[in-house]
Amino acid sequence: MFIVKVPGINGLGKTKGCEKSGNAIIKALREIHSNEQGNIIDSSLLDLEEIHLDNSNLELSNRLIYKNSLETFNTKPRVLFLGGDHSISYSTGKAFLDYCNSEKKEPCMIVFDSHADCMPPMREPTHEEWLRKLIESGFPKENILLVGLRNVWKEEINFLRENKIKTLSIANLTNDLQDMCDTIMEFANGRELYVSMDIDIADPVFAPATGYPESGGLSSRQILYLIQRIKKIKTLKAMDLVEINEKK
């Protein structure tokens, strides 16, 4: 899988530090020498790229993320984006939508997040409303699934209900993880898939390094199970991992 570091932040000052997480993740990955099946991992073979951004110029940063993401979708079979905060997912998601439209494929997005990120949009997308802006930019709302919600603002609840956005709460997920994974895979069946994962889907006991931790999340083992199931989806085109903040 091709890996792209996207050190973009627009958390209104609340996510400063997330721009460094891509390098921190790669550094940690290079210290892993085998997986739990005993297979050797050669980190020197990682296929890496970074989109160089100036976070003081949000409009330019978003254009660069979009342009580079679209090129990646057109040239790579599968890609992992390392944020950055969740604002990057607007530009990568918009590029994914345009790629699918040009290739006559049906786009699908599954978002793992404790928050809905559907507040009223600002001029440039932030980590609090990127998904709503993406929907209002044309991403088919019936093809979006929000998984793991456990702290949602009233305005967001109204938006989700009015637009009939499909959701699976954290209670749904933890009560029967295997069955919910089956539901998730069925939702993605036959569609080109983008998976966006906010690290706060995890319980802060397992992943404290994020700006908006929410108790009652998933364990690291549960997240690994999710990822292992999701990567088997043949139409999986892209994933992102966002909101890790090494300063926390």
List PLM regions with ranges.
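Conserved alpha-helical scaffold segments that buttress catalytic/binding sites
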Residues: F2-K248
